[in-house]
Amino acid sequence: MSKLSQPASTAGVNGISVIHTQAHASGLQQVPQLVPAGPGGGGKAVPPSKQSKKSSPMDRNSDEYRQRRERNNMAVKKSRLKSKQKAQDTLQRVNQLKEENERLEAKIKLLTKELSVLKDLFLEHAHNLADNVQPISTETTVANSDNTGQ
């Protein structure tokens, strides 16, 4: 097993010291800690990533600045085109669904009418059958069964 080395302290910006430690042999990585440098240091601890961005303001006339602006402008254009295309696709889908909905509603009306016609035909046929059948009295049925049994 290896031992942890002693923490090394480096003076930072705004009176903040950064304490660096080395990880032991298990491969764990430790993150640098931000600690105020002294009792009168004042201010809040700022992560190193934020410090580096604010420490060097970019010259607006530099090539790097112009390249960044150009890349940013292209990214903005691309994002806006993508957003516009998505809105158009959504609108097209809405219109397709509206048309499909209208077709389905028309089909429902047609099938409802067809069902009504078929019900009417069925009921009419059932009434015609009932009118054509003569009621059989129980006396006639008993007499017929006696005659057939001889």
From Swiss-Prot:
CDD domains: bZIP_CEBPG. One of its GO terms (biological process) is liver development. One of its GO terms (molecular function) is DNA-binding transcription factor binding. GO terms for cellular component: nucleus; RNA polymerase II transcription regulator complex. Residues 56-72 have a biased composition (Basic and acidic residues). Pfam families: bZIP_2. Belongs to the bZIP family. C/EBP subfamily. Binds DNA as a dimer and can form stable heterodimers with CEBPA and CEBPB. Interacts with ZNF638; this interaction increases transcriptional activation. PANTHER family: CCAAT/ENHANCER BINDING PROTEIN (PTHR23334), CCAAT_ENHANCER-BINDING PROTEIN GAMMA (PTHR23334:SF69). This is CCAAT/enhancer-binding protein gamma. It comes from Rattus norvegicus (Rat). The gene is Cebpg.
